[in-house]
Amino acid sequence: MTVFDLYDMHCHLAFSPDTRAAAIAMRQEGIGGMCATVTPDEYHLASLALADELNRNSNFKLGMGLHPWWLSDGSCGADAVDKLVAYAAETRFIGEIGLDFAPRRAESAQLQRTVFARIAAASRGKVLSVHAVKSVGVALDLMESVGLVAPGAPQAPQNPQGTAVIFHWFSGSGVELARAIECGCYFSINPRMLSTKRGRAYVQQIPEEKLLLESDLPPAAGAEFNAREVRALLEASLEHMAELRRCRLDSLKEKVAANSRALLEG
């Protein structure tokens, strides 16, 4: 049995030219985690390609997603939303979903809000990987409105039946970070977050029990994928995080791995 000491809690193996081969390579490198998808159709194709890996590996999960970019550019419409809501019961893992209010996508903000609220309402008791660009406050408002999060409320794994919200590559304000922490959210950290002054400050503030790692790789459909490079990336992120937090690397590595296992196996 493969022993996993690293977990990539937000990757896009379905972007790889060979999704199954990418998942096998991750396992062989000792990396577990959560593979996000960007549309319900991509999820179903990936679930077929990864069936064997998902069955044999309790530390590797596939999330059903509907990325806000695909809504914003019209690639996905009402049918995709209906599919995700209808099939959400198939999996405990939802992602990548969320909101992106960057200027180039501002015109679709109301559509994004409506869709995100509907998906959130269908996602109670699940593990969610959430994309929130210039929209963390709105995302938290909408999740609170449907009972996914609440200040001071226990989240998985403390409450096995509860929801676990993971902010992927958090880029909100300090006030929004404090609110998300109070709501019990998790945060998956990647090198781009660590490359900014604000991101590094956030890594020092996030409670240890809410820290996760991510690669966000491959970066786009058809991009080549190298699991060994992912391992090196995750290791480098951990080293940087340990330096920032002034803690032992081995201790932080085990805690982040334990956080991930609790979500994946819960």
Predicted features and spans:
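Mid-domain alpha/beta scaffold segments of enzyme catalytic cores
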Residues: 1-266
